[in-house]
Amino acid sequence: MSAPRLIQRFARPSLSPFFLRTTLARRSFGSSAIRPKDDNGRAPSTAPEHREYQTNRPPNQHVPNTTSTMTRDFPKAGEKSVPPEFVSAADPNYKPADPYPGKVEHFTGGRQETGAQKPELGVGEMEGITFKVEPLKRTGEDVSTIRARLLYQSRKRGILESDLLLSTFADVYLSKMNKEQLQEYDRFLDENDWDIYYWATQDPPTEDNVAEDTPTETWKRTGAKSGEWAQTVGAYKAAYRPVPSRWADSEVLRLLRQHVQDNSATGFHAAKSKKTGGAGLGRMPNVQVFDS
């Protein structure tokens, strides 16, 4: 449309204010049709029955992310395990057996109880498998051979985190260990890599209250009015992996934790060696050659 014709069209007077309102209403933007507030007749005939059925059903069980669904006691729907949101439909009496006591009660506010506590896994055992991976037993090795083999096993792990952790630990402590400590460290390396990493790096659970936020003035002026939730700083915490009873009083685990503390930023000043303390675990050290 040309510019003079467009100006002439906009300058044309309307017939009446009512005509202007109806024109705007007819040309309003949007794809939704105008509906009256009274929608009682639009619901299906089965809506009341379905609503009553849903409200009378028991709440679905809460399954924490630390509860394995590959075990045989988890409810099945046909050949496969049911999704977590449909557990109550398959087995309304199912109680998840979480390895961490009190976690289910904490997340459900005491509404749901934990199932039967499972025994701690032994060496070579994993959730969901029916066999046991037995570690290799070596006999007749001298101290020099044991040190060389443990150095190799400390550097060639399954994940990068345990590679850095155990290789730096072996570089500092392996040459100072006696035969009994070497044998204990040999058994310790048979554990799963993620278990070793978390046992050495995690902080033990405390009895303190869960950290809570203090609402700031900015949030009171903006977030509180808009319905936004307050930030939950400190509410997230990684699942604690308890140390099994076989390593509760281990000297090797104590030295490994001390090694982590000495190489951390907070443990730099308390480190025994100022040359290596506080340097972190960012690099695998060079291969060490043992004389004996």
Swiss-Prot record:
Entry-linked Gene3D superfamilies: Flavinator of succinate dehydrogenase
Keyword Transmembrane set for record: no
Xref: Pfam families: Sdh5
Keywords: Chaperone, Mitochondrion
Subunit text: Interacts with the flavoprotein subunit within the SDH catalytic dimer.
Cited PANTHER family: PROTEIN EMI5 HOMOLOG, MITOCHONDRIAL (PTHR12469), SUCCINATE DEHYDROGENASE ASSEMBLY FACTOR 2, MITOCHONDRIAL (PTHR12469:SF2)
Primary role: Plays an essential role in the assembly of succinate dehydrogenase (SDH), an enzyme complex (also referred to as respiratory complex II) that is a component of both the tricarboxylic acid (TCA) cycle and the mitochondrial electron transport chain, and which couples the oxidation of succinate to fumarate with the reduction of ubiquinone (coenzyme Q) to ubiquinol. Required for flavinylation (covalent attachment of FAD) of the flavoprotein subunit of the SDH catalytic dimer.
Family: Belongs to the SDHAF2 family.
Name recorded for this polypeptide: Succinate dehydrogenase assembly factor 2, mitochondrial
Organism field: Aspergillus flavus (strain ATCC 200026 / FGSC A1120 / IAM 13836 / NRRL 3357 / JCM 12722 / SRRC 167)
